[in-house]
Curated annotation (Swiss-Prot):
Highest taxon, organism lineage: Bacteria
Coiled coil start-end: none
Example of a GO cellular component annotation carried by this entry: cytoplasm
Protein name listed in UniProt: Transaldolase
Catalytic reactions of this protein: D-sedoheptulose 7-phosphate + D-glyceraldehyde 3-phosphate = D-erythrose 4-phosphate + beta-D-fructose 6-phosphate
Enzyme class name: transferase
Any one GO molecular function term: transaldolase activity
Record-linked NCBIfam families: talAB (TIGR00874)
Subunit structure: Homodimer.
UniProt keyword annotation of Cytoplasm present: yes
Amino acid sequence: MTQLDALKQFTTVVADTGDFRQLAQFKPQDATTNPSLILKAVQKADYAPLMRDTVGRFKGRALDEVMDRLLVRFGCEILSIIPGRVSTEVDARLSFDTSATVTRGERLIELYQAEGIHIDRVLIKVAATWEGIEAARELEQRGIHTNLTLLFSFCQAVACGQARVQLISPFVGRIYDWYKKSAGSGWNEAANADANDPGVKSVREIYNHYKHFGIATEVMGASFRNIGQITALAGCDLLTISPELLAQLAASDAPLARALDADSAAALDLPAKSFDETGFRYALNEDAMATEKLAEGIRAFAADAVKLEQLLLAA
């Protein structure tokens, strides 16, 4: 049995890509996209006709609408291949605007529904700022399921659980990147690998908290740098994995055991936690890593959204 097949026994495997032509070989249940992945895909010759067709069909419409329609076109193509859900992201430039995020999330769902896609097959991705979490709360109350992304801290996870969002995406690799860069020459790779990886430890803490307190929000580890990070989180509700790392898992037959377990988490002695807006902002501010990576992630996704718009204008 390959490691990929073994992982699927414990965890829902999700493909993290906009390149839907790669999906079939790995047979993922779900798929995730973001502006950076879509930008990467549309620059490939295979996807140029899809972008030109979208621009041609909706010429004269507002640029933000054309971009949303392109994201939905990719999402529909992905959903024709996978049995589960696709995550489509709201423009990161709205990360601090609750009302605008709700409006864009509703429009994305309307565009999917116009293509015959059931609402339960789409997760609206929103950055896990306070404003984003409040937008997700509103969307969930309207029956629209959400995926809270750019999640780097325990306080973000707790607030998402309080908002009863469908799913969160804690970023393993970017947490690892920050701690490795911060340590500089003092970084010990072996001592910070696998279960001791700072990104893995963050997801494990969140998973244990959710399972211990019966929080229904799904935990989907994301942003992996190596196979060790993935295998150390076997048993997590979902893991979203790049095609490159999926290929490595599919090529390996090394043993893989469950690392996270809901029953074990339920038996832990953990303190209850909750955050109001003031407490959330203070806790996030106290976490230098999370503050820096959240801001950096929003800037990067926003910049790629601008690049995507420029490609649409030039198409």
